[in-house]
Amino acid sequence: MRKLTLIRHAKSSWADPMLNDFDRPLNKRGETDLPLMARRVREFGLFPDRIITSGALRALTTAEALADTLELNPDQLCELPDLFESCSETLLHVLQQQPDHFHHLMLVGHSPGLDALAYYLTHEALKKFPTSAVLHIHLSITRWSELADSCGTVVLFDYPKMHPAPL
């Protein structure tokens, strides 16, 4: 069995209309949600063998915070700039190419690619895949190359608005 954790980047800023979409940083809510989400990932015991992330600033910032909170080694973080704006087929192909000595992968990316990949793997329709969402899937495969339609089961789905701020 393999495990896959899909994480959508923390909320990003649209404050600078001149900034390229790839280079948008986190906004105030993203900066608040990210450490809380990273701590929950740790509390859930989701320690991946590798984090694969889009190279977009908001995704990379999210992945680096996760790696730091999970106390991963720098070589466990794999930045792939081409994952920015990738469709689910591209994400699937990247995952299918991963070495089989990795049993748990974490993929930090963007909507709608993550949404479509999650549905393809589990056939569970999520109402939405909000920013800072964590979707953990158990996969009925022994090798990453076997990743296919409906091979996964959702074990956990968590996002910031499920945890209202204390009054």
Segments (PLM) and residue ranges:
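Non-DNA-binding regulatory cores of transcription-related proteins
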Residues: 98-106, 111-133, 141
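Domain-level recognition of soluble alpha/beta enzyme cores
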Residues: 125-155, 159
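Short, glycine/serine-rich, charged loops/turns that create anion-binding
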Residues: 11, 56, 112, 141, ...
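Short glycine-/acidic-enriched loop or helix-start segments at secondary-structure transitions
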Residues: 16, 62-63, 89, 116-119
